[in-house]
Amino acid sequence: MAPDQTSVKGQLIVLTGPSGVGKGTLVQLLLERQPHWFLSISATTRSPRAGEVDGQSYYFLTKEEFQTWIGEEKLLEWAEYAGNYYGTPRQPVEEQIAQGKTVLLEIEVLGARQIKQTFPSARRIFILPPSVEVLEERLRGRGSDSETAIAKRLAQAQQELQAAAEFDYQVVNDDLDQALHRLVKLIGEEE
């Protein structure tokens, strides 16, 4: 870190919402527009999907490793979702914010609630599907989950959708370009 950046403070942006709502696609598009922003890589105990790379897509951990990270306070937040653990490694986020960067977290709803306690200044944005039917189509379109997993994710989504009003902003991902435009406006083109 350069000496003149020690007093600069970045911002933490949390994107959350049900599985299949399009958080990952929106984050990818945001980073294409703002490549200087930093995407925090989450840790998880779930198995990698096709094309996912350890240390790039997620940090893939065993449940024992994840429990160790919790005990050593290496996570800003963590939650269990659909039988797996997810969490945000603390160190890279704190380093990037200290350097004045905008840090994006793409995390589950339970974790996003914890962030309000850890980082009260974080802007928490809930991404909504246009309807539950569209959400189900998106989950099935992935082709990576069993019927049981899809049913669990849809049941979880119903609960999460009821929590949308708890968050600072809500963005409906009906039209990708419009949702992206709204996010850029909420976050700010430049810090």
Curated annotation (Swiss-Prot):
Its main location: cytoplasm. The keyword Magnesium does not apply. Residues 10-188 form the Guanylate kinase-like domain. GO terms for molecular function: ATP binding; guanylate kinase activity. GO terms for cellular component: cytosol. The keyword Transferase applies. It is found in: Cytoplasm. Keywords: ATP-binding, Cytoplasm, Kinase, Nucleotide-binding, Transferase. It is an enzyme of class 2 (transferase). It catalyses: GMP + ATP = GDP + ADP. InterPro entries: GK/Ca_channel_bsu, Guanylate_kin-like_dom, Guanylate_kinase, Guanylate_kinase_CS, P-loop_NTPase. ATP binds at G17, P18, S19, G20, V21, G22, K23, G24. Its EC number is 2.7.4.8. Belongs to the guanylate kinase family. Essential for recycling GMP and indirectly, cGMP. This is Guanylate kinase.
